[in-house]
């Protein structure tokens, strides 16, 4: 019996592999526990009878078998399952046929084995148990071999389909399938039973029954009991999901256990497959893959979560650069490292904090998440890359050679070395390795980026215009806002070719002089350094300052490095919390002292220009600030403040608040004499000019009173700004250590004028005694410069465009010569400049001599704006809108009579034409002589069409042609005609609204004939008006058209009308004719033109000397009166020159008879 069972089961396993064999064994034991013994015996008899007689299946049986197999393929098609394809036991996947690896098999076999044990205890003997166990063990081995040896690949799927038919025929010969089907269909005959155990028969019969019923719905019942058992088994079993098994087997590298009712994508993880076998079918379309396990995720978040959970990410901070390519090889995806631009990719995919490069965005993201470096990335972006693009070519050399003031490399590492020793030894190329061709962005390999950023921070956060460095991006932003340098950089980039070529020393100075930081505090070093030098005579200070200037000239490349004196370094180290440049706190604090810089500048510019340009303010807001600064700063030397900051490193290096520590009242420091009085004098001179132009010439007495008032106000206010003193009027030694706190002016200082020649002599005789004195004089320069921007009250801001104009003039004049004649009045010189600007861009020494004391910052301050210190700087008349700051120590008596007498000598024609001369002068200066670009004039021209004072033919333009807007070049009469015609085309709807209708072709032709405008131009104008009305509901001459209450505006007199008819009548009053007469007028106008053009052509053809053999007629263009010998030529002319369409050619062509040669 054991051999019979073994033979039967060996034959049966083929069918089990084809069909759902993983359900076969568990269910056969389930059935063995419940099928009656009689039924089992009958099944066994049928089986043996079929085997002995070799009966073949009848037609019905064969048909049923085929149907059964076909149905099995249709339902589940187990043969197509890649379950056993390349089943690699080593992959860790337990076959569903093994009794231990599959959860479903284990689950189903549990109950069957329990039932089987009960039956065996009751019915079976020990021999039967042993035989059954042996047979089961043998069958397990057979199935294991079958599964491991079979090739269920995609190539053999079709073969396995046909194998089903062949297997059925083979089995029919051996009667295995016969027995199975006969039992299932109750065709077995009663044959004597062999002595097999009931349990074995039960096993055999139930196995066949389960197999048949699981694969076919046509299975018939053996008996009622057996049928119930089969149905129960079917309802309790779970159908095998071949697709899941295939995915799980082919995609998985780790052990996987099939769940009872798995969902396809909930349990299948999309791991990287063997693409050679299956291609991209199961690869998934995800973009983000784990490098370690190749798991794909739709989102970067999913990948990040996976990496964090599994630990598959790598700490790239610890990897070496050379090992990365080897470890992270990806067969299916070419990484950025393997492509041509891997270096560029590494530059882009780089951690901004530690400097590591990554080959993919996922790697960088994981690195950032793991290391939290995204929280530490500095928000300061490297600027020199932009600088190299935007900075003009003349500036690039200086920009690269000069180090930033705060750069770590620019500060001497040995604090004991004074400035004079350290500055010359610094090699600019070595000190600024940041700006190199191969290191554009300043990123270095490795994790040293943070250190390098700190080391190069001063160069990164550097103003591209003036070169000043800043500690934070906010400081740089504030600096750019206040000084307007960002506007200059932008404009200079577009106008690179307009730089003026100066001599090298001047050019270097221009490029290296930045505007000072606008702060309300004086540098303490100026005051602290005073006690160090026991003797401070005023002339000695002058000499030291002048000597300091010369001392710094050979070191222009070090100007921006701002080497600190040891004493300054100590103070800087003591006050690390203080910053060198304007901070947000400074902007907040500045209004306390009445120094709201932005507001004061805005008020200044708008007020001053409103007076200069016929009382209409045209600049406002930030443009006014930038315009004012650019008028002064387009040549940086024009502002006395410019150089002091960079030449004077101690001012920047020391804390801004240090001044307040020494002088609690924040008053003018006596150690900072000089430039502002010059600037104040400029302001006074320009004020005087404006008053002369307007016919108001206050008396000398009035001016003195105003000056005295201003002095007292300014001093009593105790503004936190430097002392505005003239260099020539230095305080005496007694005054150097005590700030003046009252509104009186020291008479000794007032009456101590020093000439430029004396300066030079003393400059030659007196060297700088020590670094402290030099620094003190530098600080004095810086303080005086600060006054230009900051030392003013909110009511009277200091910087005005007129003084800026004067600064520009004097700057260029200062470049012309270095001799000075201080007795010439700057006002008279201003008129000479304006009158002679067109003929003489450069001036003779007599004119230029007066500028020498002004221009102090180039060669001995030769480029200081116009110096009025030789004249009394306090006597000029003042405007309410221009601010002048009078220092307590800056007044000299030498120029009071000069200004007063010259004010009376100015002739009335000069007064009348002064503004026009100034505008011409500014245009020429800014367009031809400005080293940066013509930004001052361009700003003034572009800011408003009303600023036509900068245009050449201003006096020829009518007021309408000066108006704003894109149509400012239109003939006002043409515009009135167009507007009237458009208004006439409006149609009123019953609800009171107006509908825009197009002008008819006849109306357009009339306009075209009368105005000479092309049809295209008229169409464009109409289309533009319609677009504006649709988009905004209004245009320049028509408002609120959508509301039903339109407002018509006359562009000629600004009158307002509510209805189109009244508006048209008004426009017709301006035109002098009605629109109905337009067609008649156009014809009459053409006739008049013909009469006029005949006379013109007579002269023209006499000049042309036409040959007699020419054609009998010539053709004239009515629009421009040019003549042509052929109709074709004139039509070509009309099309190309005037844009006329061919259909209108005849309208604009006049045929003239040939003129006889004169």
UniProtKB/Swiss-Prot annotation:
It comes from the Eukaryota. Residues 186-205, 213-228, 656-671 have a biased composition (Low complexity). One of its GO terms (biological process) is regulation of transcription by RNA polymerase II. Its main location: nucleus. GO terms for cellular component: nucleus. Residues 963-1033 bind DNA. Induction: Up-regulated in embryos by all-trans retinoic acid at the prim-5 stage (24 hpf) in more anterior regions of the neural tube, especially in the midbrain, with weaker expression in the forebrain and in the eye primordium. GO terms for molecular function: DNA binding; DNA-binding transcription factor activity, RNA polymerase II-specific; zinc ion binding. Residues 310-326, 555-573, 693-716, 724-748 have a biased composition (Basic and acidic residues). Residues 70-126, 170-228, 310-341, 405-425, 516-573, 656-681, 693-748 are annotated as: Disordered. A zinc finger (C2H2-type) spans 288-312, 349-373, 461-485, 1048-1070, 1115-1138. It is found in: Nucleus. Residues 76-88 have a biased composition (Polar residues). The keyword Plastid does not apply. Keywords: Developmental protein, DNA-binding, Homeobox, Metal-binding, Nucleus, Repeat, Repressor, Transcription, Transcription regulation, Zinc, Zinc-finger. PANTHER family: TEASHIRT HOMOLOG 1, TEASHIRT-RELATED. Probable transcriptional regulator involved in developmental processes. May act as a transcriptional repressor (Potential). Belongs to the teashirt C2H2-type zinc-finger protein family. This is Teashirt homolog 1. It comes from Danio rerio.
């Amino acid at each position: 019996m054991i051999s019979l069972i073994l033979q039967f089961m060996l034959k049966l396993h083929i069918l089990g592999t084809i069909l759902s064999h993983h359900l076969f064994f568990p269910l056969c034991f389930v059935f063995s526990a419940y099928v009656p013994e009689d039924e089992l015996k009958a099944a066994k008899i049928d089986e043996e009878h079929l085997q002995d007689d070799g009966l073949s299946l009848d037609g019905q049986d064969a048909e049923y078998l085929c149907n059964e197999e076909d149905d099995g393929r249709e339902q589940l098609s187990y043969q197509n399952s890649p379950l056993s394809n390349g089943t690699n036991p080593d992959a860790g996947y337990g076959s569903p046929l093994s009794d231990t690896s599959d959860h479903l098999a284990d689950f189903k076999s549990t109950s069957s084995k329990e039932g089987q044990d009960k039956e065996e205890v009751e019915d079976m003997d020990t021999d039967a148990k042993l035989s059954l166990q042996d047979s089961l063990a043998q069958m397990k081995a057979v199935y294991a071999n079958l599964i491991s040896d079979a090739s269920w690949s995609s190539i053999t799927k079709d073969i396995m389909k046909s194998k089903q038919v062949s297997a059925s025929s083979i089995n029919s010969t051996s009667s295995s399938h016969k027995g199975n089907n006969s039992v299932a269909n109750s065709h077995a005959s009663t044959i004597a039973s062999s002595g097999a155990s009931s349990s074995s028969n039960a096993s055999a019969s139930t196995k066949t029954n389960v197999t048949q019923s699981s694969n076919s719905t046509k299975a018939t019942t053996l008996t009622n009991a057996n049928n119930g058992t089969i149905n129960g088994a079917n309802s309790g079993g779970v159908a095998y999901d071949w697709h899941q098994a295939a995915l799980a087997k082919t995609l998985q590298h780790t052990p996987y256990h099939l769940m009872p009712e798995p969902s396809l994508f909930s349990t299948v993880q999309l791991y990287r497959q063997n693409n050679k076998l299956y291609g991209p079918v199961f690869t998934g379309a995800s973009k983000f893959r784990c490098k370690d396990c190749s798991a794909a995720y739709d989102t970067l978040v999913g990948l990040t979560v996976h990496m964090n959970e599994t630990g598959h990410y790598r700490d790239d901070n610890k990897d070496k650069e050379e090992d990365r390519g080897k470890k992270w090889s990806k067969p299916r995806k070419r990484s950025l490292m393997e492509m041509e631009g891997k270096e560029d990719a590494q530059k882009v995919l780089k951690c901004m904090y530690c400097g590591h490069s990554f080959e993919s965005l996922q790697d960088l993201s994981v690195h950032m998440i793991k290391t939290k470096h995204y929280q530490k990335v500095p928000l300061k972006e490297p600027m020199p890359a932009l600088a190299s693009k935007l900075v003009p070519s003349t500036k690039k050399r200086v920009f690269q050679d000069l180090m930033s003031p705060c750069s770590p490399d620019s500060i001497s590492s040995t604090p004991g070395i004074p400035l004079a020793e350290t500055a010359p030894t610094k090699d600019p190329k070595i000190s600024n390795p940041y700006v190199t061709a191969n290191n554009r962005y300043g990123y270095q390999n490795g994790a040293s980026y943070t250190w390098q950023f700190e080391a190069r921070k001063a160069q990164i956060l550097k103003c591209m215009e003036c070169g000043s460095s800043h500690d934070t991006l906010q400081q740089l932003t504030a600096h750019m806002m206040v000084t307007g340098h960002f506007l200059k950089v932008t404009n200079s980039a577009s106008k690179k070719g307009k730089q003026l070529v100066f001599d090298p020393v001047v050019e270097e100075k221009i490029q290296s002089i930045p505007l000072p930081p606008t702060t309300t505090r004086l540098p303490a070093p100026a005051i602290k350094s005073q006690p160090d030098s026991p003797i401070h005579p005023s002339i000695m200070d002058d000499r030291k300052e002048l000597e300091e200037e010369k001392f710094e000239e050979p070191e222009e490349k070090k100007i921006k490095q701002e080497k600190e004196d040891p004493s300054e370094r100590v103070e800087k180290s003591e006050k690390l919390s203080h910053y060198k440049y304007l901070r947000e706190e400074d902007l907040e604090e500045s209004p306390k002292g009445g120094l709201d810089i932005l507001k004061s500048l805005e008020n200044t510019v708008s007020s001053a220009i409103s007076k200069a340009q016929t009382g209409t303010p045209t600049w406002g807001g930030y443009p006014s600030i930038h315009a004012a600064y650019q008028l002064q700063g387009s040549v940086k030397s024009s502002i006395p403040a410019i150089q002091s900051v960079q030449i004077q490193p101690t001012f920047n290096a020391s804390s801004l608040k240090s001044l307040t520590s020494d002088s609690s009242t924040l008053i003018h420091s006596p150690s900072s004499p000089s430039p502002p009085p010059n600037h104040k004098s400029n302001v006074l001179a320009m004020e005087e000019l404006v008053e002369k132009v307007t016919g108001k010439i206050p008396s000398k007495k009035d001016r003195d009173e105003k000056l005295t008032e201003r002095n007292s106000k300014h001093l009593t206010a105790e503004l936190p700004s430097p002392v505005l003193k003239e260099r020539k009027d230095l305080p005496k030694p007694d005054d150097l250590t005590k700030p003046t706190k009252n509104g009186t002016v020291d008479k000794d200082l007032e009456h101590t004028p020093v000439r430029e020649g004396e300066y030079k002599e003393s400059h030659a005789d007196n060297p700088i005694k020590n670094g402290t004195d030099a620094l003190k004089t530098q600080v004095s320069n810086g303080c005086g410069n600060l006054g230009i921007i900051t030392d003013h009250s909110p009511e009277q801001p200091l910087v005005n465009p007129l003084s800026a104009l004067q600064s520009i003039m004097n700057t260029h004049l200062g470049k012309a010569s270095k001799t000075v004649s201080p007795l010439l009045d700057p006002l008279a010189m201003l008129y000479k400049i304006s009158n002679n600007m067109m003929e003489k861009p450069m001036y003779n020494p007599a004119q230029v001599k007066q500028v020498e004391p002004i221009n102090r910052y180039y060669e001995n301050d030769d480029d200081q704006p116009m110096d009025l210190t030789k004249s009394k700087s306090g006597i000029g008349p003042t405007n309410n809108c221009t601010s002048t700051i009078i220092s307590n120590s800056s007044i000299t008596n030498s120029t009071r009579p000069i200004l007063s007498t010259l004010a009376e000598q100015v002739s009335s024609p000069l007064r009348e034409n002064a503004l026009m001369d100034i505008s011409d002068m500014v245009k020429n200066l800014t367009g031809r002589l400005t080293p940066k670009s013509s930004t001052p004039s361009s700003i003034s021209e572009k800011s408003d069409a009303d600023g036509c004072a900068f245009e050449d033919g201003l006096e020829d333009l009518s007021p309408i042609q000066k108006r704003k807007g894109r149509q400012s070049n239109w003939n006002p009469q043409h515009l009135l005609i167009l507007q009237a015609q458009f208004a006439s085309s409006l149609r009123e709807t019953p609800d009171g609204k107006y509908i825009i209708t197009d002008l008819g072709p006849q109306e357009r032709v009339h306009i075209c004939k009368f105005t000479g405008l092309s049809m295209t131009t008229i169409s464009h104008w109409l289309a533009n008006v319609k677009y504006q009305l649709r988009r905004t509901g209004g245009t320049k001459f028509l408002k609120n058209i959508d509301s039903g209450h339109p407002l018509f505006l006359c562009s000629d007199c600004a009158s307002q009308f509510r209805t189109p008819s009244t508006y048209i009548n008004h426009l017709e009053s301006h035109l002098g004719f009605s629109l109905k007469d337009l067609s008649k007028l156009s014809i009459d106008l053409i006739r008049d033109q013909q009469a006029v053009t005949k006379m013109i052509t007579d002269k023209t053809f006499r000049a042309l000397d036409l040959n007699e053999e020419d054609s009998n007629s010539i053709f004239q263009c009515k629009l421009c009166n040019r003549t042509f010998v052929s109709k074709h030529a004139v039509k070509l002319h009309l099309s190309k020159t005037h844009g006329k369409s061919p259909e209108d050619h005849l309208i604009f062509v006049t045929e003239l008879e040939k003129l006889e040669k004169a």
